[in-house]
Amino acid sequence: MPRQVLLRRFVLVFSLIFYLFLALSVPYSATDDWLWGMEEGLRWWLGGMLNGRYAGNFFAVVMCRFPAVKVLAMGLTMFLLPFLMALLAARGEERRFLPLFLACNAGILLMPPAMWQENYGWVSGFGNYVVSALFFLAWLLLLR
């Protein structure tokens, strides 16, 4: 197996493990996430009594009710965002993927702390904002 392929696999596996660890480290917030995890949050979502973000609220309810799902969903989404960005930017040129993947990771990890807290440090915010960005990137990839 060529050295470039091994390096690419190592970087991908390492970043997946890193993002799963980050997802495991995200606590539930007392003001919002706990409410989504209780029966009241489920009633809110089923009744459509909130903000109209039905898909995002669905992810918030599921991630707040099941901690293992939270870790997997957040970790995989955090990993897939730079992965899909790099796939889109590489435009099929395999040699460009790894540098682009590292640059996309750097861009995400170096975002301002206030933005990081709202998107990655808040489970309900993650379900509403980051998951939708992932679906948008997947849609762009399908259109390409």
Over which residues does each language-model region extend?
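Membrane-embedded transmembrane-helix bundle of lipid-linked glycan/lipid transferases
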Residues: 7-15, 78-84, 141
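Alpha-helical membrane-inserting segments
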Residues: 59, 63, 85-89, 140-143
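Transmembrane-helix motifs of polytopic, lipid-linked glycan transferases
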Residues: 76-100, 104-108, 138
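Short hydrophobic/aromatic helix or loop-helix immediately within or flanking a transmembrane segment
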Residues: 46-82
